[in-house]
Regions:
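Helix-loop junction within the histidine kinase core
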Residues: 24-35
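Cytosolic transmitter module of two-component histidine kinases
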Residues: 59, 200-262, 269
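Glycine-rich ATP-binding loops of the HATPase_c
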Residues: 169-175
Length: 269
């Protein structure tokens, strides 16, 4: 327990130091974007693992809505894009005790050379008062709208996000209903490094038998959409229950697994 507390305190201190350093660089005009190729889906996967760990024992689902036309490789400052998303996700997880945190990424205004990446993070937390929403992106601003939470950090996180988004020529904003939910969103233009959508898989891989069964309808629909993006038709839960086909990979959650573990093991044999 002591080691865990030390780690948490150390991480918090490191985040504060990083915020101050980034803010100082931006204010002095020394912050530079480092543009290079990056894989957005790989970034999203890493973030998923990171935040499932941070959610821990909370009764919160981490949901995704990813545009299937998102190219495999983009060209931009992927580390700063990741930093912006992490900062907003951190706040969403911190202020949501039950319900969901949803990361959505859409492709807009796409040309042969570039596209607009439209990112939103929505949560079912306690929301933010309208008068406080205007302060969120100001430097050293900490609002106490959110119930039962103490102020933490420097108050620089969202200000840094705003400045990074603006450096990329984009816009950032928030929509919130106090007592219900919040949605932070931003848009940035990114170059397309390789016109290769996430859907691309070698032909021999498209014969894979992939099934999915989730207790949550939203998760089920998103799973099927992502699998179809790879050119594979997923095996639906009713087909698996009725015909018991062989599947190479089966994705499920704990509730479904515990209820149907015998049938699941039979399909994978």
């Amino acid at each position: 327990e002591y080691l865990s507390n030390i780690k948490v305190s150390g991480d918090a201190l490191l985040n504060i130091i990083n915020d101050i350093l980034d803010f100082s660089k931006i204010e002095s005009g020394k912050m530079e974007l480092v543009e290079e190729d990056y894989a957005p889906m790989s970034m999203i996967s890493d973030l998923g693992i990171m935040f499932l760990t941070r959610i821990g024992e909370k009764n919160v689902e981490l949901l995704y809505d990813i545009d299937p036309t998102l190219p495999k490789t983009l060209h931009g400052d992927g580390l700063r894009v990741r930093q912006i998303i992490i900062n907003i996700l951190n706040n969403a997880v911190k202020f949501t005790e039950r319900g969901y945190v949803k990361l959505s990424i859409k492709v807009e205004d796409k040309t042969e050379q570039d596209l607009v990446l439209a990112v939103s993070i929505k949560d079912s937390g306690s929301g933010i008062r309208e008068e406080d929403q205007k302060k969120l992106f100001q430097s050293f601003s900490q609002v106490d709208s959110r119930k039962n939470h103490s102020k933490e950090g420097t108050g620089l996180g969202l200000a840094i996000c705003r400045q990074l988004v603006e450096m990329m020529g984009g816009q950032i904003g928030v929509r919130s209903t106090y007592g219900q939910s919040s949605e932070f969103y931003f848009t940035i233009r990114q170059k397309i490094s390789e016109e290769s959508p996430v859907a691309s898989l070698p032909e021999e891989k498209k014969t894979l038998q992939i099934g999915g069964a989730f207790s949550n309808t939203y998760l089920q629909e998103n799973f099927e959409r992502l699998v179809r993006a790879y050119g594979i038709e997923p095996i639906a839960p009713d087909v698996m229950a009725k015909d018991r086909p062989h599947v190479d990979f089966l994705f499920t959650d704990t509730l479904v697994y515990e209820e149907h573990k015998d049938a699941i093991h039979g399909s994978l044999l």
